[in-house]
From Swiss-Prot:
One of its GO terms (molecular function) is N-acetylglucosamine transmembrane transporter activity. It holds the Pfam family PTS_EIIB. The active site is at residue 397. This is PTS system N-acetylglucosamine-specific EIICB component. It is found in: Cell membrane; Membrane raft. GO terms for cellular component: membrane raft; organelle inner membrane; plasma membrane. The gene is nagP. The chain crosses the membrane at residues 8-28, 42-62, 91-111, 130-150, 163-183, 223-243, 257-277, 279-299, 329-349. It comes from Bacillus subtilis (strain 168). It is an enzyme of class 2 (transferase). Its EC number is 2.7.1.193. The EIIC domain type-1 forms the PTS system translocation channel and contains the specific substrate-binding site. The PTS EIIB type-1 domain is phosphorylated by phospho-EIIA on a cysteinyl residue. Then, it transfers the phosphoryl group to the sugar substrate concomitantly with the sugar uptake processed by the PTS EIIC type-1 domain.
Amino acid sequence: MLSFLQKLGKSFMLPIAVLPAVGIILALGREDVFNIPFVYQAGTAVFDHLPLIFAIGIAIGISKDSNGAAGLSGAISYLMLDAATKTIDKTNNMAVFGGIIAGLIAGYTYNRFKDTKLPEYLGFFSGRRLVPILTAIITIILAGIFGVVWPPIQSCINSFGEWMLGLGGIGAGIFGLFNRLLIPLGLHHVLNNIFWFQFGEYNGVTGDLARFFAKDPTAGTYMTGFFPIMMFGLPAACLAMVVTAKPSKRKATAGMMIGFALTAFITGITEPIEFAFMFLSPLLYAVHAVLTGLSLFIVNWLGIRSGFSFSAGAIDYVLSYGIAEKPLLLLLVGICYAAVYFIVFYVLIKALNLKTPGREDDDVDEVLDENTVQDVNENIMLKGLGGKENLQTIDHCATRLRLTVKDTALVDEALLKKAGAKGVVKSGGQSVQVIIGPNVEFAAEELRAAVK
């Protein structure tokens, strides 16, 4: 089950990757920016069809070779599922959840039947051409079931969503806490998609993220509080790790941490920072999770409201500024959070003598020069994963290599970190996650090339 959820979380990355560009288009077309209606409507169209985009993206993400036939099957499945369930009961609105179901149907159908050979007189429909046909048949059967069972499920989801929204800041704080606690397992994407794309409805769009860009005055509850963490808190934690580093390693540590901090501040990608201390001190990471939950509670209590299309970095802060509420106060909260994070990290690192970057007893965690990254991926990283023979599947999400290996005991964490990995997670069974950062796609391609 854990492996399935991790794979599902990874598959969310393709459709989510579309949203930053769409967010920029939407922002540029808004009345308060350039007031270009056709540009604004072009961006709105994507948010209006998020379920279809998720169906296509998840189908491709689930498929073993990311083939377009899986994406086509996902689109067919969603269109059929949506139309059929609404015919059975007009109140049915599976929204993004319908897209997820359709993507799963198409992805697993593709994996199972993509190599199927039919008799010669039906040979044209063999292999990948067979997948959309079988997907359609399976979808019709499941649509009949979902058309009947979905209304009570939808009622439960709506009730839970209304209950969480009714909790206000407390509910937002609980979400923020678990959002961070699930990162080590890579399951935070699953939680995020429930809150950001499913809960609440406004003018036909669902989820906190889509509702915010549709100008729902109540949206932003589950996004706003991440800005103080990602733009200010974690960059301040980087500063604390630089200050507490050994004098002989402070310059090298600063070079690495400045890059991490800028990435977090500008884009909102924070995993490279979090994995620098996550496993060194679970207590420190737990404090970080609590502070995240507290941030979501505080900004809600102060009546601050903002949102993002990708993550809570400076880019999305600027793009959302025109439709945000009290955006300047959000910066003040962020500055306060920077002070809190610096003090907490400085004190705990010193008091617990944590071996954060720059405080190691040996050089196993040193990151090699950027000029040797390609060689690292082909040699040291491959060796750290137990060699070609140990690798079964190679995939990735936004910041992590997601691998399946024959024997996790052969995975050498010290070697992987020496190769530039920010962290390693053995998440049960044969699954291994290697945290790389925003350039993970290139690392995955180089690793695939190395094992051929």
